[in-house]
């Protein structure tokens, strides 16, 4: 923290020039419980919730349903080596952060925890669900109607691909498309321009039950123009791409916000094909190189988009991990145009870029022999993380329309829609295939996961291998940024050393793990003391992880509850004693206009409200002091002290008139 003091004259000088209160790093303020008291009645109360836990096959859900994409759909066959990270319903926090009304977000509540919140009397309850969780949505609706009967129910999420007739019995409103605009209109709040306020959402990654990394989630866009015939997210938004963060500058502002929390934090950009928008990516690269801090960004991409960049350009954009679709050799999607994927994936790996790639089973041309041939070619590319999904129809997609027209839905699924919904998880064959039975396709899927793990070993070891490739290529680079990136890779490799001891003892490819460890030791030297201690403890941690997996212990997350503007002092327009406060959100800033008489109480409450506002988004705040506003210098100094940790994001300007000008001169 940069230490500084602000005299009243310095504050007045900065106010005249409309400049931020200083520069430099800052700590993130805790969300306070006080702000500007609203005028009149408070707005309606909003509760946004996911479906309830427990989830999983043991609780009546489809095979891959749970809380984790990696463990459930990618590294599901890797046992103790599977990285663990809970994926939340991120859109709920994003919507809540961009309303004016008080809002509470619940992530994976139990029935009891949800009931406790419902008894507080929300006016609206939003429920987010996917198609595969339709039955879970019905459970939540029943609880709402019993314990908050006056609340209006809003259904949202990709489960709303179903038609109105199917959903009408369960909701008063159906949110399809972009949720912030929908909810603001529903609550009769004025439209808000993009980019919206961006909440901080951070995920923890564990290996052998030990926290290893934190990832900040960046909401950059919705929808995808590629329009693959099976893709729900593309057709849900009518093949349109909605830029939640329109420019590279907007994205980088969020990046810097996360770096304030942790300079080494990993980042994930949620955008179906982030690199397809070259203007944003090019500007991001300029800003990343200008700052010089080596970043670790994971992004969704396509062969078409990746072919437009060199691996070095990707790294200089901060991207060192991508999710790209392999799909099938003859699937023929437009997004696969560009470099042959047989060259693309090895090239990315050789430059230190990890690759999560997805292969699909069940295309019309597939037979067991063709699937095994494609699997062998796919595994030869050594993707860091492999995913294998069954080609399936989702309402609203061209594939679904074709299957229904041809009458090829499995009869038991067609006869029981809720059974069909429950099995829309990518791990159940739902279509009558010309060459294979459903059970055969599902067995081949399991074979793919098992074969990958047996031949290529744990993905966490593959990650270290890719980082090492990047380190070897760039640790003597002419580029200062890439040298710094190589240094970060080296530190991450040494931090990950404990995985080798477990991989040698319990992994399917102990010889490969031993060779990689020896090569790394020869290049980087022995690991530091901390890594050696963790290596000694790693087998015990891995054994504990195996025990919890075998006995289904500690496999469910705890409730995550976040409240937005839930106190009577939430920052909003209103009367604060004799000080009138008016808020106006501009494109990149929130304007706070104050007028009247400023005293100690109003200064403290205004500062608390500004801190709360900035804690939940990446905007700036500009305080406009109206002409004729009366304030003693000590109250302006108090405001400055209260906002010290965030001074680089706050500015104050004074609409100077005779009385105000006299005050500033005397200050």
Segments the model singles out, each with a brief description of its role:
Residues 2-264:
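Acidic, low-complexity intrinsically disordered segments
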Residues 146-152, 295, 319, 352-353, ...:
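A short helix->loop->beta-strand "cap" motif at the edges of active sites that frequently abuts
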Residues 1-69, 107, 117-120, 150, ...:
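Radical SAM enzyme core and accessory elements
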Residues 600-666:
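Amphipathic alpha-helical interaction surfaces in cytosolic regulatory modules
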Residues 154-160, 269-274, 626-627:
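Glycine-rich beta-strand-to-loop/alpha-helix junction loops that act as flexible
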Residues 55-58, 163-165, 279, 361-369, ...:
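Flexible glycine/acidic-rich beta-alpha junction loops that bind and position SAM and/or redox cofactors
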Residues 166-183, 311-324, 373-388, 645, ...:
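Structural recognition of alpha->loop->beta junctions
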Residues 201-356, 361-363, 369-376:
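Radical SAM [4Fe-4S] cluster-binding motif and immediate context
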């Amino acid at each position: 923290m940069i230490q500084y003091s602000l005299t009243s004259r310095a504050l007045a000088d900065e106010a005249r020039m409309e400049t931020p209160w200083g520069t430099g790093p800052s700590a993130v303020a805790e969300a306070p419980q006080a702000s500007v008291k609203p005028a009149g009645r408070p707005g309606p109360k909003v509760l946004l919730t996911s479906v309830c836990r427990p989830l999983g096959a043991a609780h009546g859900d489809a095979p891959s349903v749970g809380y984790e994409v990696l463990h459930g759909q990618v590294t599901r066959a890797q046992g103790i080596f599977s990285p663990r990270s809970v994926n939340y319903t991120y859109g709920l926090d994003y919507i809540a952060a961009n309303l004016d009304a008080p809002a509470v977000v619940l992530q994976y509540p139990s029935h009891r925890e949800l009931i406790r919140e419902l008894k507080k009397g929300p006016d609206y309850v939003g429920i987010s669900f996917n198609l595969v969780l339709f039955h879970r949505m019905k459970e939540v609706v029943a609880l709402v109607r019993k314990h908050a009967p006056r609340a209006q129910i809003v259904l949202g999420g990709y489960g709303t691909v179903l038609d109105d007739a199917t959903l009408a019995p369960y909701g008063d409103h159906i949110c399809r498309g972009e949720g912030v605009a929908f909810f603001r209109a529903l609550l009769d709040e004025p439209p808000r321009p993009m980019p919206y306020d961006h909440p901080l959402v951070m995920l923890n990654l564990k290996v052998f039950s030990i926290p290893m990394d934190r990832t900040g989630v960046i909401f950059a866009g919705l929808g995808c123009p590629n329009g693959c015939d099976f893709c729900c997210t593309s057709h849900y938004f009518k093949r349109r791409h909605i830029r939640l963060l329109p420019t590279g500058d907007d994205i980088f502002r969020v990046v810097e916000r996360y770096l304030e929390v942790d300079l080494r934090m990993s980042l994930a950009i949620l955008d179906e094909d982030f690199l397809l928008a070259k203007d944003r990516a090019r500007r991001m690269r300029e800003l990343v190189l200008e700052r010089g801090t080596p970043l670790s960004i994971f992004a969704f991409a396509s062969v078409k988009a990746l072919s437009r960049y060199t691996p070095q350009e990707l790294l200089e954009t901060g991207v060192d991990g991508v999710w790209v679709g392999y799909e099938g050799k003859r699937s023929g999607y437009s997004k696969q145009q560009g470099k042959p994927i047989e060259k693309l994936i090895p090239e990315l790996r050789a430059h230190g870029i990890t690759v999560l790639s997805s292969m699909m089973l069940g295309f019309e041309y597939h037979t067991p022999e063709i699937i095994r041939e494609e699997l062998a070619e796919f595994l030869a590319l050594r993707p860091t993380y492999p995913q294998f999904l069954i080609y399936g129809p989702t309402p609203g997609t061209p594939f679904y329309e074709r299957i229904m027209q041809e009458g090829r839905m499995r009869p038991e699924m067609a006869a029981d829609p809720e059974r069909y919904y429950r099995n829309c998880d990518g791990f159940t064959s739902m279509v009558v295939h010309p060459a294979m039975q459903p059970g055969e396709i599902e067995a081949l899927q399991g074979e793919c996961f098992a074969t990958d793990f047996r031949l290529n070993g744990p993905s966490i070891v593959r990650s270290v291998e890719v980082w090492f490739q990047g380190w070897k290529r760039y640790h003597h680079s002419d580029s200062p940024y890439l040298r710094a990136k190589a240094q970060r890779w080296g530190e991450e490799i040494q931090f990950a050393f404990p995985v080798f001891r477990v991989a040698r003892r319990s992994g399917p490819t102990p010889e490969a793990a031993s060779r990689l460890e020896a090569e790394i030791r020869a290049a980087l030297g022995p690991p530091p003391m901390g890594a050696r201690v963790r290596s000694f403890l790693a087998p015990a941690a891995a054994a504990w992880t195996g025990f919890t997996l075998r006995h289904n212990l500690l496999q469910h997350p705890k409730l995550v509850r976040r409240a937005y503007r839930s106190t009577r002092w939430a920052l909003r327009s209103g009367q604060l004693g004799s000080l009138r406060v008016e808020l106006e959100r501009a494109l990149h800033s929130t304007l706070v206009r104050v007028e009247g008489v400023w005293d100690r109480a109003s200064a403290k409450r205004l500062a608390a409200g500004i801190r709360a506002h900035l804690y939940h988004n990446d905007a700036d705040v500009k305080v406009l002091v109206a002409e004729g506003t009366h304030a003693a210098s000590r109250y302006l100094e108090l405001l400055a002290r209260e906002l010290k940790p965030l001074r680089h994001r706050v500015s104050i300007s004074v609409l100077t008139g005779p009385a105000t000008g006299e005050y500033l001169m005397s200050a």
